[in-house]
């Protein structure tokens, strides 16, 4: 990615800022005059260092520079009184661009405190961590709306999406109440946000949750056994909300999950979006930044139209693939239309008015509201395009327990994939639970990828048709069996088996392509985004 961006970055760097001291020394407008000890509020700017002259603004883009440099009044962060009983420092966060830390109250409830401004220094190769390039990449932070995250909670609430409720503060330049980490946020504009990491963190909507985990843990649990499932309907709803507000940075690390016990003994994990740093993004409004946006489609401006659904969803490709596998076109359109009904003009107006500081609302409020209304009208069309991208290749994983994958090529417009779990009476008994089922149309879906993972799995493919998606079968490390009696018109074989050459049984037909090999890499599956 950095290599692709290097030519336009060099262009941008030619006009970018190369100051060694890039960031404002204190967010307060009155700096260096000291803030009175008992002050409850302060007049601050989120980042007046992003304000540039006419030439730089023409080339790099106006972005949200005026909003970053707009003086606003924010409450002073007081660790001892910000919540009942006060907050104490627990640990530093691991973010590369923002400074973050975990704080806890006396009941054990945890919060995240993090800077609104970013420093991408650590994300760059060492050779680029200086001069024009560093200054330009730092300057790109001004494309983010610094107060956008505070607009989202009422919108998410109306949409039926679980959410955190961040609040903005100013940290005194002489604040010492955060222990040895105090100096990391002194003089900064920050947000305080709920964390969902233990049972003490429950809010009303999560009162019945058994457990909270991050995506890597949840995915590991999902693939370990058949008792853990992802709430794909809730995830789809959250992702369409992401599209509507232009949040393109929704990778797997941007989600918490809450586990809810189900009557059948399974656990349903519901998503909780977090870290709304990139909502209402405004980037391709300069001559050179426009060039960059054509190279990297996710860097588009939040406006009345959805400029690139592929760009908006690229960062979330991994988690989307794993959390939307059963969602049909009808589900996408039904959810989009439901959101249209929920996200009324009044909801939009109240969210924007309450979320933005009044000085920022006067500048940006009307434009943001108009864009949200226009995008709401186009949401079903955006959802249909999102479906098209997700439906092209669908990954259907099993678990580390035994499963039976049944593929029925019914006709030229319908191939049904069903996954069955273990029956109570044993492998060959009746009544095996249905874990997954979806009907695929080859006009929408090119390939369905089946992963057995661990356990001795069985794959059965049948039916004679003229058209069908490719069925790619990856058995896993244990002994698996594939039975393929299907036939699809044309010269290409549409059932492909990928696994190790030994310890598997392949009963294939004319439609089967044997892609087995000696390496265990042949059936590798990335469970949690680590690449392992």
Q: What is each stretch, according to the model?
A:
Residues 172-247, 260-270, 282-285, 295, ...:
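ATP-dependent phospho-/nucleotidyl transfer catalytic cores
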